[in-house]
């Protein structure tokens, strides 16, 4: 039985590259994102190279969509919490609160919603590995980035706490901070 990897935000950038790489390494890929056409292109690329890929179109900002899409899954060996957003980078006194909500809902709450559904499956299976894509901005803040940097600092803290929570269940938690 092939190992299964779930990648959020797999429609571009790090998520897409990770899906392609893990498929080459023999993982069955479950690629998620908001843009169905990009997921279809990724699925085509993986399957054309001999891999296996399932796509799920949903927005990690919606707990209901996350649960509906992910609860039916039986086993996940590797989770890559990659979905992320940097929007409306402005000085704090000029920021648009809608952009702030979008970043926090995607970068923090989305990661939590996905992990809340997948972690119990890993616990039941006796192990797994969760990769959270943070950012160096989480520990090295910059001008115009207060909310984005704060959201990635949250990913850093969540990753450390998740590691402590899940270690005894045989689940590794790794934060990657590009």
State what each model feature region is.
Residues 11-12:
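Conserved glycine-rich cofactor-binding loop
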Residues 93, 142-146:
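Active-site loop immediately N-terminal to the catalytic Tyr-X3-Lys motif
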Residues 27-41:
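Conserved glycine-rich Rossmann-like NAD(P)H-binding loop of the short-chain dehydrogenase/reductase
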Residues 135:
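Residue(s) in the substrate-gating loop at a strand-loop-helix junction
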């Amino acid at each position: 039985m092939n190992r299964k990897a779930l990648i959020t935000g797999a429609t571009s950038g790090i998520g897409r590259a990770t899906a392609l790489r893990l498929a080459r390494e023999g993982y069955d890929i479950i690629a998620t994102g908001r843009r169905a056409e990009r997921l279809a292109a990724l699925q085509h690329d993986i399957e054309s190279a001999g891999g296996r890929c399932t796509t799920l179109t949903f927005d990690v900002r919606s707990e209901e969509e996350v649960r509906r899409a992910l609860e039916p899954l039986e086993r996940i060996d590797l989770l890559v919490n990659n979905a992320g957003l940097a929007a409306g980078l402005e000085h704090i006194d000029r920021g648009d609160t809608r952009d702030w909500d979008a970043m926090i809902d995607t970068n923090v709450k989305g990661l939590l919603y996905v992990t809340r559904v997948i972690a119990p499956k890993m616990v039941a299976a006796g192990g797994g590995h969760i990769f959270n894509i943070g950012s160096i901005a989480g520990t090295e803040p910059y001008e115009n980035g207060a909310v984005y940097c704060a959201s990635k600092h949250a990913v850093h803290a969540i990753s450390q706490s998740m590691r402590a929570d899940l270690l005894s269940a045989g689940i590794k938690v790794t934060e990657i901070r590009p």
